[in-house]
């Protein structure tokens, strides 16, 4: 379906004509707004500044306001807000005063899912990639799903799209427990880790119970697809009173991977499924964590009747997601070039998975890493884990912590991380103060054949394109969306 082709609004929401998003440029908001636009609703939204995202929505017919003001809500039948927006926001305050409904983004997503065949992907890590893989395999199988993803699906050029089938594939966000709004027919749990613990009062058992509650939102005829390689997911499995299908490398998995082999960006493996012939597949992403993401996809696709041919095609043709081990291109250095990679990972487990993928696909190459921790609270809570995993790089440059609205926490900053990593004796990290231009610092450290990884969830997101366009790297080669050099 053409992305901006208009469909009919949902009859169940016939009283709603104009929907206003507060913070419409956010990654969790813009996708829902785009789907609603394509369903025929009037959409408006505000954000603190314009962006490529808001320009895209404007091109589809959304009315965009820069800044938050009470008058932006005129004509709105409902306001959609993210968890970062509170009642002190002038638009929210005005809506409440005028008795205009104010709903969390997850509740609006739940309404889109309510009358569709919903597939919700939850878990601390791997949600975006797994959701994207499912959408790609379903598309290869001719099912034309609607999808709402927390990252840019390279093949589609967007993080959301309205399909013609009843399938709706979306991420389920545990960071604020808003995934409890969703009532899908199929739910995935990739893993459960200690992150966003403030939402759960610092109680890991409460986090585990919330995931069980999420799975119990499934109907009795639904399906919970669970990765039992993760010890916490395995731990909650007996508590889930819904039909389940398990996946992983474990021998007791319902869907299992064997014979994994990695060759650069390509990963090859064989899938074993109960009462099925073995299936040989490949995916254009490195690392065992992406094998697990692929297994979740294969489990759901098999259960939904997608053919093996479409599964193989959808996985092998997958072009990746923005900032998930995204190969940006090559930087010229003396004697050759350096592969430039950008990645969103910001939890020690995600960092470890990416480093493992680099070692598996390019065992003879050095890893030069520029890393930016995200949030002081996360750095504090997972400090020792960060020290251990970041010490595995060959060369490490640490940018200062991206605060994401938090106040500094004593001891939980990048200068202290550098000191702790240095004490391990494996490498001597370089501390980067805020505002320092990276290209002149990075270039002397690079050797031909290196892999340069820019990783983190903060404003490091703009570093890879800046390096690619830096006058210090004249002749840099840009990669296509498939990670191939143009």
Curated annotation (Swiss-Prot):
One of its GO terms (molecular function) is UDP-N-acetylmuramate-L-alanine ligase activity. It comes from the Bacteria. It is found in: Cytoplasm. One of its GO terms (biological process) is cell wall organization. NCBIfam families: murC. SUPFAM superfamilies: MurCD N-terminal domain (SSF51984), MurD-like peptide ligases, catalytic domain (SSF53623), MurD-like peptide ligases, peptide-binding domain (SSF53244). Keywords: ATP-binding, Cell cycle, Cell division, Cell shape, Cell wall biogenesis/degradation, Cytoplasm, Ligase, Nucleotide-binding, Peptidoglycan synthesis. Its EC number is 6.3.2.8. This is UDP-N-acetylmuramate--L-alanine ligase. It catalyses: UDP-N-acetyl-alpha-D-muramate + L-alanine + ATP = UDP-N-acetyl-alpha-D-muramoyl-L-alanine + ADP + phosphate + H(+). Pathway: Cell wall biogenesis; peptidoglycan biosynthesis. One of its GO terms (cellular component) is cytoplasm. ATP binds at residues 123-129. It comes from Pseudomonas syringae pv. tomato (strain ATCC BAA-871 / DC3000). Belongs to the MurCDEF family. Cell wall formation.
């Amino acid at each position: 379906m053409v992305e901006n082709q208009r469909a009919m609004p949902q009859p169940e929401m016939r009283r709603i004509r104009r929907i206003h998003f507060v913070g419409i440029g956010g990654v969790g908001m813009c996708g829902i707004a785009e789907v609603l636009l394509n369903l025929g609703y009037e959409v408006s939204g505000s954000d603190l500044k314009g962006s490529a995202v808001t320009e895209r929505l404007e091109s589809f017919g959304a009315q965009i306001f820069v800044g938050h003001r009470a008058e932006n809500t005129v004509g709105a039948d409902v306001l959609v807000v993210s968890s970062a927006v509170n009642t002190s926001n002038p638009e929210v305050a005005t809506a409440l005063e005028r008795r205009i409904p104010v709903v969390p983004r997850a509740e609006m997503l739940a309404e889109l899912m309510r009358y569709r065949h919903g597939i919700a992907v939850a878990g601390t890590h791997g949600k975006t990639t797994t959701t994207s893989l499912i959408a790609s395999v379903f598309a290869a199988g001719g099912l034309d799903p609607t999808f709402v993803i927390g990252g840019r699906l390279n093949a589609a050029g967007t993080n959301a799209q309205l399909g013609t089938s009843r399938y709706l594939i979306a991420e389920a966000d545990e960071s604020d427990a808003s995934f409890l709004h969703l009532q899908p027919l199929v739910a995935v749990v990739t893993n459960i880790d200690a992150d966003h613990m403030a939402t759960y009062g610092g109680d890991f058992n409460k986090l585990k119970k919330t995931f069980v509650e999420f799975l119990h939102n499934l109907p009795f005829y639904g399906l919970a697809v669970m990765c039992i390689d993760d010890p916490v997911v395995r731990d909650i499995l007996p508590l889930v009173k819904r039909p389940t299908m398990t996946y992983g490398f474990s021998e007791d998995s319902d869907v299992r991977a064997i014979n994994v082999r990695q060759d650069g960006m390509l990963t090859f493996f064989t899938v074993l499924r109960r009462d099925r012939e073995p299936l040989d597949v490949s995916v254009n992403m490195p690392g065992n964590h992406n094998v697990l993401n692929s297994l979740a996809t294969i489990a759901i696709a098999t259960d939904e009747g997608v053919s093996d041919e479409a599964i193989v095609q959808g996985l092998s043709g997958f072009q990746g997601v923005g900032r998930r081990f995204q190969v940006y291109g090559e930087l010229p250095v003396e004697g050759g070039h350096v592969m430039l990679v950008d990645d969103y990972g910001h939890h020690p487990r995600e960092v470890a998975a990416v480093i493992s993928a680099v070692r598996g696909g390019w065992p003879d190459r050095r890893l030069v890493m520029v890393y930016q921790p995200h949030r002081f609270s996360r750095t504090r809570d997972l400090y020792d884990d960060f020290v251990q995993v970041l010490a595995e790089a060959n060369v490490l440059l640490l940018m200062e912590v991206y605060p994401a609205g938090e106040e500094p926490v004593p001891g939980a900053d990048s200068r202290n991380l550098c000191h702790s990593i240095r004490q391990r004796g494996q490498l001597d990290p370089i501390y980067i103060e805020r505002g320092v231009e990276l290209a002149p610092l990075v270039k002397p450290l690079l050797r031909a054949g290196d892999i340069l990884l820019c990783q983190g969830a903060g404003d490091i997101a703009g570093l890879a394109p800046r390096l690619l366009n830096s006058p210090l790297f004249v002749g840099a080669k840009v990669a296509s969306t498939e990670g191939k050099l143009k």
